[in-house]
Every structure is written in C-alpha cells, then in structure tokens.
Amino acid sequence: MNKRRILFVCLGNICRSPMAEYVLRHQAAERGLSHLVETASAGTSGWHDGEGMHRGTRAELKAHGIAADGFSSRKIRREDPAHYDLIIAMDDDNLAELERQFG
C-alpha cells in the first residue's frame, strides 16, 4: 500500500501546523503505521522561513513525549498540492489563502 502524504498548513508554520504534523507522525509510529503515512507542514506566509518551532509548541509536544527535533519552518510551495494526497488548513483564513494561491 502506498504512503498517504498529508500536509498541514497554518499561517507561519511555527505553531499549529507543525504540532499537527508531529502529533500525527507520533500517533502513526505508536500504532505501527509509519509506513502508511508521510506528514509535513507549511505556512501560507513566509514570515518565519527557516525558523524552528515556537517554544510553546515544542514544550507542549515534549510534555506529551513527542520529540520536535530537526524542524525548520517553510512556506507552502507551488509543487506541494501535486505532491500531497491531503492538505489540511488549520483554520478558515488559511483555507481561503490556499484557495487564493492555488485555486
């Protein structure tokens, strides 16, 4: 079975979308399903490109036993919609921005 590629998207890609990315990845690993899911995240803006996760997000993940190592924020790219099977906007404003950018 092919991996399902899931992209979570919020505004800056330092809080909500990376948290969703890491939680889903962790949940899949706990259930032995990592081979079925590829997760990633991005932002609709490039304000925080290359930055790490917000410290509060990292702390919350750590409190739940989820390591948040190696994260670097990024803006959604033109090729992302073709690469991912499912893109989840973290709120209505980001959904509207995705629709504006990608139709």
Regions picked out by a protein language model, each given a short descriptive name:
Residues 1-84:
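Conserved active-site segments centered on acidic
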Residues 74-103:
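Glycine/proline-rich loop-helix segments at beta-alpha junctions forming the active-site rim
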